[in-house]
Amino acid sequence: MEDEHVADLLIAGGSADPNLAPLVAAAERAGRSVLSIVHGPEGEPAFSWDLESNRLILDGREVGARGAFLRYDVFTPPVEARGLDRNGGWYAAAMGWALSRPGMRLLNRAMTHGANQKPYMLRLARDSGLATAPTLIANVEADLRAFPAPAVAKPVAGGGYVRPLDAALADAGWREGRSPIPAIVQQRLSYPEHRIYLADGRFHLFEIHSDLLDYRPGRPTSLVYRGAELPWPGVAEALAKLTAAVGIDFCACDFKTEAGRAAPLFLELNSGPMFAAYDLAAQGRLADAIVAQLTQE
């Protein structure tokens, strides 16, 4: 067996994930060495972590890393022949090893449970000084039908697209005036939509236009990088307060426009966002910032 190889950055995830390649390219630009744990239908690495010695043997070689970027694979069907979650298993193994390494640089290592709770984050955003749209979280048919139009509905726990409220009401599966799951219902806002990434202690602003209510199922009409400065007074300070409150140091926050209001309204925070298309629009600046955050001395 070869002596331990310690890389500057471990990158782990699924072979079909388009977000990994920009990080590898950014690491190469920065002169950082990369260790990969990439799994997928075409093959798996040989992974053996002995907890007694705390040594990781990867493809027959003892390895280590100073920083790590790890993503759960959402691009490959997760269930293998015996009904086990292959993607979850690889993520748990790699993340478990990374978390056990003292001093390992990770994104959002201090993140609290609340960061991934969308209703809580809407309330906390208000408390932090960010404006949000009028919002109702409910499964009561009468209350939802009384919400002022135009309005939209979105899954309370994420994992789905934004829909017109009328369409959501039509197939909600009502039983005795209640739906099976509460929904987030909000005033319908307009484009432009803004996505703000936090990486390496700085914000990165993108402006999005689309003909769709929710641009994510297709491609936006335009996606433009607007730089590292936020043009709305007080938004950067409020967003910094929000992310600090939940231990976030890397994320994407989405905002949308209300007619007559200068600053956009906060929609949600994503603690594990995709970023490949945004990095392309920013000509590599976003991936460069992520690599810098994970490899700086």
Could you say what each language-model-derived stretch is?
Residues N270-A282:
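Glycine-rich phosphate/pyrophosphate-binding beta-alpha loops
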Residues G14-A26, L35-A131:
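Conserved N-proximal alpha/beta basic substrate-recognition cap immediately N-terminal to
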